[in-house]
């Protein structure tokens, strides 16, 4: 996945120079395996605490969009907005939603379109409305209407986010109370291990099935009809997961960039040994994102390391800290390949150190994952954090279902079966 995106970015480089904009970031979706040892730490449920914005903005330049620049779709977007407003006042809300969405897709940085759509949604979806107000402020930081709307919506959004994190913490505590040595928990951990490797590699284009992945990890035997590279990707992620589980989650000190390099060394150790654990020496392009130049990598990574060791993580909820760490690393993109996988391992190491199981991002969720990262690139990291939170909750639910006996046909049983289904109609 990483290599494909780099090639696509190279083809679009001239377009990037002409547009002179920094837009969507697409990265590989990487996961880790369930921990053998979880250490429960106290967590503070916060959203936008002191230092949160500073932590987010470190290493990431401010991005503003000139709403006055009209492209060929500008007029069409305003026409859709006008039609949406008419449908809204006529009580035809379903049609209004489609027209608002069309207007936003045609002019995604136009403040008036974002504001009107947000005001339309606020009563029924205040989280999405506040996100639209935030996007309007990114396009025009001095927009008084956008400021007023966001100030009105933000307290409600903070309360909802707080409730979401509290709910996940309660489920984490319930899971933590189950003996790690119990047979159901051991089975759940083992199955999750294979699930993580399978989904991680599938998202990057690896065609190994779940059963093939399990066979390679358990026997180290080759699977007929599959490339050496695909085998090596499975072996590399297997070693990286073992390193995270046996070393990082039991480490008393904070995670540093040295640990990140060690993760990467194992991720690419079989597939690309010459690049494993080394910063890139060439410029790369990831979709529409242009990472820092090679000569700036050491400075950027040192700044990232300073942030990891600072007091900022202590005021963040572990899910926020983990998601931010992941985002910062993929933004820098310090390696030629394997950045997404390494960032996901870093994120899950942070979660496990706080008593959470590692997040499972399913192959079929990749589109949403890319979209939330794209939104982060445009100034709002919170949709990405919420996505990570939902994935964390779903993972905990799967563990609880695996370790609880339910009657055949019970809703929980069906959920667990769906979570473990390796088939995907898109593959």
From Swiss-Prot:
Keyword Signal tagged: no
Residues marked Important for autoinhibition of adenylyltransferase activity (site): 204
Enzyme nomenclature, EC number: 2.7.7.108, 3.1.4.-
Keyword flag ATP-binding: yes
TM ranges: 17-37
Locations listed in the record: Membrane
Catalytic activity: L-tyrosyl-[protein] + ATP = O-(5'-adenylyl)-L-tyrosyl-[protein] + diphosphate; L-threonyl-[protein] + ATP = 3-O-(5'-adenylyl)-L-threonyl-[protein] + diphosphate; 3-O-(5'-adenylyl)-L-threonyl-[protein] + H2O = L-threonyl-[protein] + AMP + H(+)
Domain Fido: 255-390
Motif Inhibitory (S/T)XXXE(G/N) motif per record, residues: 200-205
Quaternary structure and partners: Homodimer.
Protein name, UniProt field: Protein adenylyltransferase Fic
Source lineage: Eukaryota, Metazoa, Cnidaria, Anthozoa, Hexacorallia
């Amino acid at each position: 996945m990483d290599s494909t995106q780099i090639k696509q970015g190279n083809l679009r480089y001239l377009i990037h120079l002409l547009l002179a904009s920094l837009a969507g970031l697409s990265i590989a979706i990487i996961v880790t395996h369930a921990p053998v040892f979880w250490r429960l730490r106290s967590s503070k449920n916060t959203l936008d605490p002191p230092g949160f914005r500073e932590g987010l903005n470190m290493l990431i330049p401010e991005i503003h969009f000139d709403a006055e620049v009209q492209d060929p779709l500008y007029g069409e977007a305003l026409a859709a907005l006008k039609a949406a407003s008419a449908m809204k006042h006529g009580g035809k809300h379903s049609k209004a939603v489609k027209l608002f969405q069309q207007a936003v897709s045609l002019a995604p940085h136009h403040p008036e379109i974002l504001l009107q759509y947000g005001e339309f949604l606020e009563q029924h979806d205040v989280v999405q409305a506040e996100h639209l107000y935030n996007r309007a402020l990114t396009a025009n930081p001095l927009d008084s209407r956008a400021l007023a709307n966001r100030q009105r919506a933000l307290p409600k959004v903070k309360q909802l986010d707080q409730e979401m994190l509290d709910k996940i913490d309660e489920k984490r505590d319930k899971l933590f109370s189950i003996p790690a040595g119990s047979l159901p928990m051991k089975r759940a951990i083992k199955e999750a291990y294979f699930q993580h490797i399978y989904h991680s590699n599938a998202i990057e284009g690896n065609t190994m099935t779940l059963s093939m992945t399990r066979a390679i990890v358990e026997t180290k035997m080759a699977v007929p009809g599959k490339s050496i590279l695909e085998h090596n990707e499975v072996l590399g992620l297997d070693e990286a997961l073992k390193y995270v589980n046996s070393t990082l989650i039991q480490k008393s000190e904070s995670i540093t960039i040295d640990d990140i390099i060690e993760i990467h060394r194992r991720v690419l150790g079989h597939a690309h040994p010459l690049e494993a654990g080394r910063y890139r020496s060439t410029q790369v392009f990831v979709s529409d994102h242009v990472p820092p130049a090679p000569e700036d990598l050491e400075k950027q990574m040192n700044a990232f390391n300073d942030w990891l060791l600072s007091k900022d993580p202590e005021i963040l909820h572990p899910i926020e800290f983990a998601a931010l760490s992941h985002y910062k690393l993929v933004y820098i993109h310090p390696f030629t390949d394997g950045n997404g996988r390494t960032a996901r391992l870093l994120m899950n190491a942070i979660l496990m150190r706080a008593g959470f199981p590692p997040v499972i991002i399913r192959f079929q969720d990749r589109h949403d994952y890319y979209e939330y990262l794209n939104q982060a690139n445009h100034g709002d990291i919170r949709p990405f954090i919420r996505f990570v939170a939902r994935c964390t909750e779903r993972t905990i639910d799967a563990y609880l279902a695996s370790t609880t006996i339910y009657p055949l046909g019970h809703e929980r049983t069906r959920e667990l079966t769906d979570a473990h289904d390796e088939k995907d109609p898109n593959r």
